[in-house]
Amino acid sequence: MAGGGGAERVRVGAAAAGLLPPSCRQPRRRESRERLSVCSKLCYAVGGAPYQTTGCALGFFLQIYLLDVAQLDPFYASIILFVGRAWDAITDPMVGFFISKTPWTRFGRLMPWIIFSTPFAVISYFLIWFVPDISTGQVMWYLIFYCIFQTLVTCFHVPYSALTMFISREQSERDSATAYRMTVEVLGTVLGTAIQGQIVGKAVTPCIENPPFLSETNFSVAIRNVNMTHYTGSLADTRNAYMVAAGVIGGLYILCAVILSVGVREKRESSELQSDEPVSFFRGLKLVMNHGAYIKLITGFLFTSLAFMLLEGNFALFCTYTLGFRNEFQNILLAIMLSATLTIPFWQWFLTRFGKKTAVYVGISSAVPFLITVVVLDSNLVVTYIVAVAAGISVAAAFLLPWSMLPDVIDDFKLQHPESRGHEAIFFSFYVFFTKFTSGVSLGISTLSLDFAGYQTRGCSQPSEVNITLKLLVSAVPVGLILLGLLLFKLYPIDEEKRRENKKALQDLREESNSSSESDSTELANIV
């Protein structure tokens, strides 16, 4: 690879000396001001849909699927959810490490990860939604394939997230591409909710009026076995519906990966063209974790993201049992996601007009009154839909802002450590790591708390203790986490003035690097 860098300098030097025709010369100064086409931004944005589509389907439906369709004990379901999310979190820095060691290829450094992980991710995703016909080992089946899928989708999403820094050198173009990406990602959540919810919703999952029998006489045990056999048989349509939905989402996953790989090309930093020395991951990790702006940003978003993930993981059960909208919850979820999709452009305009920190406070805090309203008022379908639409506006801000602010932190890091390069994947992977790990802990604990409250698998109704627990999990706890996260954002140092200063300083640094490179190349051309 080092030889390739030398050849690049000779090529530039020859161009400077007039030895190459104008069509072959590389306009370095113009390149830094090139704009991304709308087509390139759309192709880049489409790549964000697979992660969100599968993640939304798993986030909203996996818990209720394990409890009421696979009929696992809540304790084992909590283990699967916790271990799967925790493993998902661990794989992010692991993949980030291997990406930092990956050499550049003709397809780039990041794109091969996306291409080769896709088919295996789709297969493992489908097997998560398949109920094996085995009397024992179901827990291990779901645990293994859930972890395999999380590993493979991480191999897709971490390089895709880091790709933000390599589609353009212009901060404004990256922000614009990020807005496109967030719009498509939220649209991906709409697709995930719509496909999974509408297909599964058409197959009515039967419930048990009085589960389970409290008497342990031989007669009651025999009757219980007969009833459970009958109900298991009646679940066939529901199980088939889950597999059909998984097949459709898997097809979309492949389509989006193809569009991304064909329509987007990685761009290397001009300074990186001069050296292909291997990057020290652990030295980079130490530098990243000591960067104050990064720690303050991910800490704030850690709590706010955790609030929305906790809401996501328990909302289906909350709508089904606490609100009593068993046949409407998929439409309520769809209303949230549609509202979020339609308001992404508004938040992009808002953060451009008023600044990103202001957008954080206004956007995320707007969810608080609606989270309180949905549990304080009596169950009312119209009010629930209004709350869902309003909550979607806040969800849009929570989607957009972290990914719009992380590149600002990376630019700040580059100015403080101009000699340290190739650590972009570390920033993104460890942000996702902390978010996923804490969400795994919270989701595992929330499912376990339902078990302690007396959750009845496939019951038509639940004990009052379960309803109280669900209210806490979708209202009180998320509100507390949001308020704590917003308090921590007060410490985040990069405001709009600081961001503009960093942008100008980074542009000056790049122009200085380009000028130095061109001077060296001219001297080399004169020697030639």
From Swiss-Prot:
Family: Belongs to the major facilitator superfamily.
Gene3D superfamilies referenced in this protein's UniProt entry, alphabetically: MFS general substrate transporter like domains (1.20.1250.20)
Matching InterPro entries: MFS_2, MFS_trans_sf
Biological processes annotated in GO: carbohydrate transport; fatty acid transport; lipid transport across blood-brain barrier; lysophospholipid translocation; transmembrane transport
Keywords: Cell membrane, Disulfide bond, Endoplasmic reticulum, Glycoprotein, Lipid transport, Membrane, Symport, Transmembrane, Transmembrane helix, Transport
Annotated protein name in UniProt: Sodium-dependent lysophosphatidylcholine symporter 1
Function: Sodium-dependent lysophosphatidylcholine (LPC) symporter, which plays an essential role for blood-brain barrier formation and function. Specifically expressed in endothelium of the blood-brain barrier of micro-vessels and transports LPC into the brain. Transport of LPC is essential because it constitutes the major mechanism by which docosahexaenoic acid (DHA), an omega-3 fatty acid that is essential for normal brain growth and cognitive function, enters the brain. Transports LPC carrying long-chain fatty acids such LPC oleate and LPC palmitate with a minimum acyl chain length of 14 carbons.
Cytoplasmic side: 1-37, 100-109, 162-176, 264-295, 352-355, 405-427, 491-528
Ranges in the topological domain labelled Extracellular: 67-73, 130-138, 200-241, 320-328, 377-381, 451-467
Protein's gene: MFSD2A
